[in-house]
From Swiss-Prot:
Keywords associated with the record: 4Fe-4S, Chlorophyll, Chloroplast, Chromophore, Electron transport, Iron, Iron-sulfur, Magnesium, Membrane, Metal-binding, Oxidoreductase, Photosynthesis, Photosystem I, Plastid, Thylakoid, Transmembrane, Transmembrane helix, Transport
Function: PsaA and PsaB bind P700, the primary electron donor of photosystem I (PSI), as well as the electron acceptors A0, A1 and FX. PSI is a plastocyanin-ferredoxin oxidoreductase, converting photonic excitation into a charge separation, which transfers an electron from the donor P700 chlorophyll pair to the spectroscopically characterized acceptors A0, A1, FX, FA and FB in turn. Oxidized P700 is reduced on the lumenal side of the thylakoid membrane by plastocyanin.
Name of the protein this chain belongs to: Photosystem I P700 chlorophyll a apoprotein A2
Positions contributing to phylloquinone binding: W671
TM region positions: 46-69, 135-158, 175-199, 273-291, 330-353, 369-395, 417-439, 517-535, 575-596, 643-665, 707-727
A molecular function (GO) term: 4 iron, 4 sulfur cluster binding
Species classification: Eukaryota, Viridiplantae, Streptophyta, Embryophyta, Anthocerotophyta
Length: 734
């Protein structure tokens, strides 16, 4: 008999019901649970899959370059970045009638096209690409890289090239290589590209392979470097009247510390960016020589951790036992990696708009909104994943003997205190914030807006002032003309910073008031509640007073039958599942806030946000309803417009979202009865009953249905908001 899916589980492949298919898909990537898995094969499979992942990323980015080169308008956009709309790719759709073809033929194209809201045009322009040929060369190079990585992945699965477990567990060597090689050398290479290609291009000098070795990035070459006169590289920076991509007003500096933004492009100075990457490179290349490997010099991570015992003994045995615990647990390592990547992704969202590094991207409002929202949602999923794998670590990999009285054991021992404090913070934030919003709502409804409770965010304003924002009248640090920091800043470092922070046309340190204070606390409520659910899920994953033997049931179980009185909904997976809803809603509030604040800033009517954001009806009426009205009107009796695709996606997103509830609200028995009825009907219907099934149809398990419901909820939620965001922004600003 031919082997059936899934090959990795003999038991499951013999299941006579449709559970075989769904459970097979669900456990396909849980390598640890597969038949005949050894630690060595586990590590090798994961290692090989990393090469596949990188190949997919390179193929995808190659596709972006290729489609823009083939169907885009890059060269036309380069001539006039502020007025030509960048084209992502053409649309071929046989359903398009004349009105649709007309509506979607934009950006100087000959037929229907999609506009690019990803910022790739601005990115490629900033790093020195100027022609379609440049894009094609980039696409081919990335395609070649993808092939190299696929071959490397295959190679590392061959017996001769398979790394051993000891190689995977050599933490010091890996850290050295990742710090020096991955971060350090790649940052150095990027600084090199900026200095040799991007900065000359921004000054109208075209550097390509034919003149790379003959075009000097700086008139004095390497002489100042070897003489230690490094300051020469910062002299004669681009002037404030510099026209980007031309020599007019251009300087010769390559490494500067100007601060603020280029007046024309509204983006960070390229010479500042090159300086930043060079500094990062130096720091990380040094950091990558810190850990002890074959040469007997440098730090041993294990020794550092073992030595970390808190003074006075009040905090137990500190980090003792952590080295082996982390080094032997892939889930712990993945949890740490996801936690840091999640934070970094959220920081990227924050910095891409407040300190834009790509030329003209700050004036492309729809792209700014799309990139912020995209990175915040990605960050949310990655961060919840960190806690999920933290919980799996506690269930599968945590060994109480190895971690006696260290920080991990102590976290578990006083989990009640941690969870109850988080609970208190969430309750406090929720009741007070909602109380203020509802009070203000009632005052507006009764026609007495002056009775609203409006709280100025004085601490946040004080922090903004310390950084140089003079508007609030706090006279301190960088906002005080008498402070040493202010005086030093004029000449030595960041002279452009103070101009930028006090200029109302950018998004650096936005002016804040009572509306910001309220929504800030609403977001804090969401963050704390999400964290509460996730932390509780991980800390209770091994067991709780209610269910001390929980870890024996694994990561995801529905219940332990009716006999134990309430063991449903308490698996670590359930905590993750509930937290994702809170995460999505929290990021909803974050993106609503960001988008409304910026729409009013870009339209020049900040008063609308300031006045309407202090009560709930303001948010519902003046943000959601007002900005979705165009969307709902994408199709009408008078034809269609270029927003109609977003109108359709807005409707479709709601549909997908609502479908989620079908899986979330009704339980398994209902579906099992329905399936049995349909099966009965099928078997008794002529012609239909000629078609038989190999697997007996059964309903999804409770956990599987929750996953399907959660996926529909998440996808629908994001589709709906994406359509709303892009249509409402592009409808206003083009």
């Amino acid at each position: 008999m031919a082997s059936r899916f899934p090959k990795f589980s003999q038991g499951l492949s013999q299941d006579p019901t449709t559970r075989r298919i769904w459970f097979g898909i669900a456990t396909a990537h849980d390598f640890e649970s597969h038949d005949n898995i050894t630690e060595e094969r586990l590590y090798q499979k994961i290692f090989a899959s990393h090469f596949g992942q990188l190949a997919i990323i390179f193929l995808w980015t190659s596709g972006n370059l290729f489609h823009v080169a083939w169907q885009g308008n890059f060269e036309a956009w380069v001539q006039d970045p502020l007025h030509v709309r960048p084209i992502a790719h053409a649309i071929w759709d046989p359903h398009f009638g004349e009105p649709a073809v007309e509506a979607f033929t934009r950006g100087g194209a000959l037929g229907p096209v999609n506009i690019a809201y990803s910022g790739v045009y601005q990115w490629w322009y900033t790093i020195g690409l100027r022609t379609i040929q440049d894009l094609y060369i980039g696409a081919l190079f990335l395609l070649f890289l993808a092939a190299v990585f696929l071959i490397a992945g295959w190679l590392h699965l061959q017996p001769k090239w398979k790394p051993s477990v000891s190689w995977f567990k050599n933490a010091e060597s890996r850290l050295n290589h990742h710090l020096s090689g991955l971060f350090g050398v790649s940052s150095l290479a990027w600084a090199g590209h900026l200095i040799h290609v991007a900065i000359p291009e921004s000054r109208g000098e075209h550097v390509r392979w034919d003149n790379l070795l003959t075009a000097l990035p700086h008139p004095q070459g390497l002489k100042p470097f070897f003489e230690g006169q490094w300051g020469i590289y910062a002299e004669n920076a681009d002037s404030s009247s510099h026209l980007f991509s031309t020599s007019q007003g251009a300087g010769t500096a390559i490494l500067t510390f100007i601060g603020g933004f280029h007046p024309q492009t509204q983006s960070l100075w390229l010479t500042d960016i090159a300086h930043h990457h060079l500094a990062i490179a130096v720091v990380f290349i040094i950091a990558g020589h810190m850990y002890r490997t074959n040469f007997g010099i440098g730090h041993s991570i294990k020794e550092i951790l073992e030595t970390h015992t808190p003074p006075g003994g009040r905090l137990g045995r500190g980090h003792k036992g952590l080295y082996d615990t982390i080094n032997n647990s892939l889930h712990f390592q993945l949890g740490l990696a996801l936690a840091s990547t999640g934070v970094i992704t959220s920081l990227v969202a924050q910095h891409m708009y407040s300190l834009p590094s790509y030329a003209y991207i700050a004036q492309d409002f729809t792209t700014q909104a799309a990139l912020y929202t995209h990175h915040q949602y990605i960050a949310g999923f990655i961060m919840t994943g960190a806690f999920a794998h933290g919980a799996i670590f506690f269930i599968r990999d945590y060994n109480p003997e190895q971690n006696k009285d260290n920080v991990l054991a102590r976290m578990l021992e006083h989990k009640e205190a941690i969870i109850s404090h988080l609970s208190w913070a969430s309750l406090f934030l929720g009741f007070h914030t909602l109380g203020l919003y509802v009070h203000n709502d009632v005052m507006l409804a009764f026609g007495t807006p002056e009775k609203q409770i409006l709280i100025e965010p004085v601490f946040a304003q004080w922090i903004q002032s310390a950084h140089g924002k003079t508007l609030y009248g706090f006279d301190l640090l960088l906002s005080s003309a008498d402070s040493p920091a202010f005086n030093a800043g004029q000449s030595i470092w960041l002279p452009g910073w103070l101009d930028a922070i006090n200029n109302n046309s950018n998004s650096l340190f936005l002016t804040i008031g009572p509306g910001d204070f309220l929504v800030h606390h609403a977001i804090a409520l969401g963050l704390h509640t999400t964290t509460l659910i996730l932390v509780k899920g991980a800390l209770d994953a091994r067991g709780s007073k209610l269910m001390p033997d929980k870890k024996e049931f694994g990561y995801s179980f529905p219940c332990d039958g009716p006999g134990r009185g309430g063991t449903c909904d308490i698996s670590a997976w359930d905590a993750f599942y509930l937290a994702v809803f809170w995460m999505l809603n929290t990021i909803g509030w974050v993106t609503f806030y960001w988008h409304w604040k910026h729409i009013t800033l870009w339209q020049g009517n900040v008063a609308q946000f300031n006045e309407s954001s202090t009560y709930l009806m303001g948010w519902l009426r003046d943000y959601l309803w007002l900005n979705s009205s165009q969307l709902i009107n994408g199709y009408n009796p008078f034809g269609m417009n270029s927003l109609s695709v977003w109108a359709w996606m807005f409707l479709f997103g709601h549909l997908v979202w609502a479908t989620g509830f079908m899986f979330l609200i009704s339980w398994r028995g209902y579906w099992q009865e329905l399936i049995e009825t349909l099966t009965w009907a099928h078997e008794r219907t002529p012609l239909a009953n000629l078609v038989r099934w190999r697997d007996k149809p059964v309903a999804l398990s409770i956990v599987q249905a929750r996953l399907v419901g959660l996926t529909h909820f998440s996808v629908g939620y994001i589709f709906t908001y994406a359509a709303f965001l892009i249509a409402s922004t592009s409808g206003k600003f083009g």
